[in-house]
Design a protein with these regions (language model features):
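Beta-propeller-forming repeat regions
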Residues: 1-166
Length: 166
């Protein structure tokens, strides 16, 4: 997945990306790419790994928002798992808490439950209490759920919706 968000608070939209693969230069990892001063002439954008080898199981889409109210942008991610996941470590939803230095790896918080086909995960204030909750879908599976901030209690939105992918 790819997403744009201002991760470092400099007013520019950065790119967040994950490969979802267990091999390569950054296995089971996800990163954000810092916008260079002159993007048109830049040969490379600076890469910062926020999920360092702790996003196994064919991770998919990303979301971003300040989930704990500390003023820093946290990142959400899902891993679909399934037959193609040779690690057997997928089928989860999680969020990564940004520290004071967003160029360093973030702290992972795995959300409750096992979720075959986990794909989309977006912060949203579902219950109107002013705190960002998390809405998530099992796009390669069945169902739509939300997690209630701050204890992350899971609530079903629809448990028979097939492949709610995008």
């Amino acid at each position: 997945g790819v997403l744009k968000a201002d991760v470092n608070g400099d007013g520019k939209l950065n790119l967040l990306a994950n490969s979802g693969q267990p091999m390569g230069k950054f296995p089971n990892s996800a990163a954000w790419l810092e916008v260079p001063k002159n993007p048109r002439n830049a040969k490379r954008w600076t890469r910062h790994i926020f999920a360092k080898e702790d996003a196994p199981g064919l991770s998919h889409y990303l979301g971003a928002g300040d989930l704990n109210g500390d003023g820093r942008l946290d990142i959400t991610l899902a891993a679909k798992g399934g037959a193609a996941d040779k690690s057997g470590m997928g089928e989860w939803f999680a969020w990564w808490e940004a520290g004071k230095d967003p160029t360093q790896p973030f702290k992972k918080h795995k959300l409750p439950g096992k979720h075959p086909g986990a794909t989309n995960i977006m912060p949203a204030d579902v219950n109107g209490d002013g705190k960002l909750d998390i809405v998530a879908s099992r796009g390669h599976g069945v169902g739509l759920i939300w997690y209630e901030n701050p204890k992350w209690a899971m609530h079903e939105i629809n448990n028979d919706l097939q492949s709610p992918h995008c």
